[in-house]
Amino acid sequence: SVRDADSEKKSLFDGDEEWKVSHINGYLIAAPDVYVQPRRSPVSEWVPAMTFGSMANDGGNLILQPEEADFLMMKYPRLKEEGAIRPFIGSEEYINRKQRYCLWLLGIRPEVYENIPEIQRRIQAVKSFREYSPRAATRKLAKFPEIFGEIRQPEQGKYILVPRVSSWRRSYIPMGFLPAETIASDAAQMVPQATEELFGILTSAMHMAWVRAVAGRLKSDYRYSSSIVYNNFPFPDLDRESADDIHEKAARVLAIRE
């Protein structure tokens, strides 16, 4: 019967080891059926929000390969001086140390780029791409073809970049601080106004145990989401001594990386 089947012992495996347990839940652990639900904001009040990076929604026309960026900055030095070409980084670029750039014309005076044919061609291509989109929201963006479709980049300071997907073979998720001048793509997530204390907790064994338990998976790799993983994580309230200790150790890790 169904009741007899429910009462039978189940087998739970870890490598070559097998355990007999009474119940296996959706996280593949011997525990009751309790599931983490998505949240829109962190359960811990002291941590800043995690967001996606900025989405170009441009048909690839605002994105530059390193040689394209170098050519434009050499031919038109003012583009570099004004910050119109920025490093552009997502999960793959961060993890594999790849370089990409983007045209970042938000807040840049039109006189800086309006007479540059290479840029004007790209802007017109973005406009056409958006105008012919089946999505009404994207078509509206055709009015502003020189800028990204969704902009979430902090204007100053630094942020922690967190890859959306990373290998399960790693003992921790590779993440780190980047300056506001480096544009985070929507292929990654970021935490603006982040501190060394937050970095220390996010790269801790405690947080990784949480990731392994509740994060989604792509094949076997971790899919880190703000709504499930970050927002539900019970970040501990830190007294001054604990905060200073975490800050010191995180700063040491960051210094070794450099």
Predicted regions and their residues:
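Conserved beta strand-loop-helix elements of the APE1-like EEP
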Residues: 1-8
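Polybasic, glycine- and aromatic-enriched phosphate-binding surface used to engage nucleic acids
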Residues: 12, 16-255
